[in-house]
Amino acid sequence: MANYKVEDIRNIVLCGHGGAGKTTLADTILNATGLVKRPASVDEGTSICDFDEEEKAHKYTIESSVIHFDHAGKRFNVIDTPGYPDFIGQTIGALWGVDNAAIVINAQAGIEVNTRRVFAEAKKAGLGRMIILNKMDGDNIDLPKLLEMIKDVFGAECVPLNVPLGIGAAFKGVASTLNPPADTADAVIDPKSIHENLIETIVTADEAVMEKYLEGTMPSDAELSSLMIKAVYEGTLIPIFCVSTKTKTGLTELLDGLAMCAIPPTMIERKAQNAAGEEVTLSPDPAGPLCAQVFKTRVDPFVQKLSFIRVYSGTLKAGVQLSASTARRGIKIAQIFEMQANETNPVEDAIPGDIVAVAKLEELETCAVIGDLQMDRFPFPTPMVGLAAAPKSRGDEAKLSGALAKVTQEDPTFLCERNEQTKQLVITGMSELHLQVIRERLKRRDKVELDTKEPKIAYRETIQAKSEGMYRHKKQSGGAGQFGEVHIRMYPFPEGTDPEAFASNKEMFPSMKAFHYEPSNNFLWIDAIVGGVIPSNFFPAIEKGFKDRMEKGVIAGCKVQDVAVELFHGKYHDVDSNEHAFKTAGSMAFKTVFLQAKPGLLEPIVKLEVTVPMANVGDINSDLPNRRGRPMSMESAGGGMQTIVAEVPLAEVLTYNRTLASMTGGQGSYGIEFLRYDVVPGNIQQQIIASAELAEEEE
């Protein structure tokens, strides 16, 4: 059993923008608490938390990493996360596995794009939030201006719990604003000037204490300590700490502050669903029913698959048969590990609040719930940047499949699927950098190299007019021949049209006998044969001919959709007619009539949501017409950000991430969601058809 209680656990994620010093802070804490004897350095490739080979090569965090330490009677589980938005999936998973978020800000750089993003995500996850101003030993820091900006962007709840004594090279310590020292001569900001605001912010967490305070009675230290955690929990206080991880100045005070302010697992109310679908509140009781969730998966070359788990209720034990939401049968955990970055330490069990890992359980996936309850999946963002990928060596195709399966397990923001229309394997991630790192990992870990290029757009073909025609397939080469004749009418069949109502229109189809509707491509075919001119046993072959041609396309090699076909006449031969003949006749009749029915191309239209600083709204709106975009709405996203919603052809936003980064200096984000297919303008249509014809000739 653990030698600490649930109420003594403090789970914190370190998050923020890249270069803020999160990993260095985690490494420094391990060194300061005596768990690691040697100093660690990200730049020198000796970081404890950045142990992955790609992290060492790039000198920044790519994977979240779990460490633990004890301080001031508290058990800390801390998760270091990537700072670049390209790897936001790792941060999202970590946020939903903890109770507190410490947003680390580079005091020299101020609030950056991912600072805003993770702050909003931490609020969405219902976490207690704290801000750590790092690199206080740096040059050109305007602390009053930075604090004012933090309040403007994140709210008046952001109040310093300490202020620096000196700044830049003169930074030599911090002074408490909760208990200001008598001598504050070296303080950059007088802590006494913040003290009253801090106390008022804290006491608002309890009406009775606040009333006494307003009447002149100062709360006791015990009351302040208790109310501070409550205020952080309720979001009415977001404490700010000053530190330099490089010199370790302010580090002890930071750890003391985290022990004093961070929320324990006993305070956050977690919800789950029972077998009946009813909502239940989880109790962080070691004796309660087990409920734990996987928030991260890592494929380790030594211990194979590692599943990182947060326990919410009950006690997780090894050697016990357990149920899991992603396993068909029960699972049995062989060993439970306490993690120190990439080091594993076996433990007997895990209580509520514990963050542990288990190995070699293929059935467990990220977001899987262990126990008999269900919990919601984490809100991972949808990846937007896709590349068509193929192994450089044809002999690596089988190996590539397994390698990509590993990446898909590890990274919820990576997708891999084969587009049946374009015949391309498309890998999709958060950015080009994200996909580049994945390619590097595949090369190192799995010995598979990839060639990538911009993916093809899955255009569709359709018609805009009614047409009628026939095709006779006749072949005689000695012996039994082939004969089949098919007469059809073709109609535009817009998406949303009721197939039964359409086929039952007696004015259009007076001889309709039956109809068949295929929703996948919105295709309706109608049997209107009179007098048995084609035996009904050949109808499936004719329909197969239609469908094969629709799959292959007619004008540009794209799938056909939104078409209705009426089979109204034909001929057959007692000897030479067979299924193959009528399948061919059906396919060629479809092609012939399609070409007469004003054929055209459809393209996927997506909803584009772009969130940018107010200063960039004009740039975004000016750029949309160049992408054939149609603005739909605009609303405030908070923190000086605006969200613009528009409808845009997918073909126009394949590389939008580059444009957006250029226009906003990396401060913008976007998402796309498929809406519908729409007609491609004529001039663009001709270019697409010409490219398809050229590609066919080259093949």
Feature-to-residue mapping (PLM):
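Structural and coupling elements of P-loop NTPases
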Residues: 1-699
